[in-house]
Amino acid sequence: MKDLVPLRGIIFDMDGVLVDSGAHHRDAWRATFREVGLTPPPDFWRITIGRPADEAVALLVDGLERDEARRLADVKRRHYTRLARRGTVPVAGVPAFVDALARGRVPRAVATSATRRDLERVLVELGLRSRFDIVVTADDVRWGKPHPEVYLKAAAGLAVDPGACVVFEDAVVGVQAARVAGMRVIGVTTAHTGDELIRAGAERAVPDFRDVSWPV
């Protein structure tokens, strides 16, 4: 890549990047559909990856009124909270990498489609809450990914130009959001393949953080 702006800030998605939560989310969606007596589409999981629950519901079930979509999203969040009590597991290498960034005083943020309640729980359980300068959640934005709002707010909170930020993302819609925001992206292959993430705009992809160091 030519004429790259020197990187100054780093932004992480949460689910599938900091925490290996995919199985909990898949099971929560399945439990939600069972509870309301609906059959999910075969590719339901891929449709929901990286999106706020309210927006994902509207894509999964045609013709829902806004209040009903919100109710189903609340059901999904309830099931996810129950399942997440089984334990929170970081993606391999995350604690060491984030600690190294903190020691190096690299501006760092989390920008997620999860609620603030879920984010706070995850970061506290991982022992990482104090390691992030800025967190932006679904509660803080009007538009979910692939809209760039969550990433632009994170960059503004860090006081770093978007072009000087690199994002770690596991979702195609998240990669698209970060690219529209003008940021560089490295894919994390916990939900999509490396080829899928690169086609969406990631410059490369990694399986986890065990071999990642700063500058990336």
Residue ranges of each PLM-predicted region?
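N-terminal helical cap/lid subdomain that shapes the substrate entry/recognition surface
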Residues: 3-106, 117
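Conserved G/P- and acidic residue-centered "switch" motifs that form tight phosphate/ATP-binding loops
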Residues: 13, 17, 112, 170
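Asp-based, Mg2+/Mn2+-dependent phosphohydrolase catalytic module
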Residues: 1-8, 99-102, 106, 115-216
